[in-house]
């Protein structure tokens, strides 16, 4: 495994989440134990497009980052750790749960560790 592969894996996972938010918001939110109101669906669609943009960035970073590649890996490690913390907080507060929340919690933790470890190896 290398940092380029971690970016690509993260990009594919982001595409899955982005498409889920954009086209299957009701199901996506129901799986997180949230009531899918029209307003939440609208925010979810906007967030879905944003996540799709992040997926595109994650896919392209290995090809365009140059000397900053390792630093960007470390930055993404921090970002995934932040997502892990906010998802964990929402689960603990009872604001999210179900398969969506727990699977994403595990995925964010794994990706944070992989980004950190692989970016250190790339230095």
Show where each model-derived region lies.
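Membrane-helix boundary elements
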Residues: 3-6, 14-41
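Membrane-helix boundary connector in multi-pass membrane proteins
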Residues: 63, 85-102, 120-121
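Membrane-embedded alpha-helical segments of multi-pass transporters/permeases
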Residues: 22, 59, 88, 112-116
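Membrane-interface helix-boundary motifs at transmembrane edges
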Residues: 1-3, 62-69, 95-97, 123
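Core segments of alpha-helical transmembrane spans in multipass integral membrane proteins
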Residues: 16-22, 40-62, 75-82
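Non-cytosolic membrane-interface motifs at loop->transmembrane helix junctions
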Residues: 33-41, 70-71, 96-106
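Membrane-water interface at the C-terminal end of transmembrane alpha helices
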Residues: 109-123
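Residues within membrane-spanning alpha-helices of integral membrane proteins
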Residues: 7, 11-14, 48-51, 73, ...
């Amino acid at each position: 495994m290398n940092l380029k592969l971690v970016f690509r894996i993260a990009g594919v996972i982001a595409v899955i989440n982005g498409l889920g938010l954009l086209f299957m918001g009701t199901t996506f939110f129901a799986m997180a134990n949230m009531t899918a109101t029209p307003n939440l669906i609208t925010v979810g669609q906007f967030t879905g497009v944003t996540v799709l943009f992040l997926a595109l960035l994650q896919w392209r970073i290995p090809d365009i980052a140059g000397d900053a590649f390792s630093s960007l890996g470390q930055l993404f490690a921090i970002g995934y750790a932040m997502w892990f913390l906010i998802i964990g907080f929402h689960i603990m507060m009872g604001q999210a749960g179900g398969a969506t929340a727990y699977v994403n919690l595990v995925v964010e933790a794994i990706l944070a560790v992989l980004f950190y470890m692989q970016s250190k190896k790339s230095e």
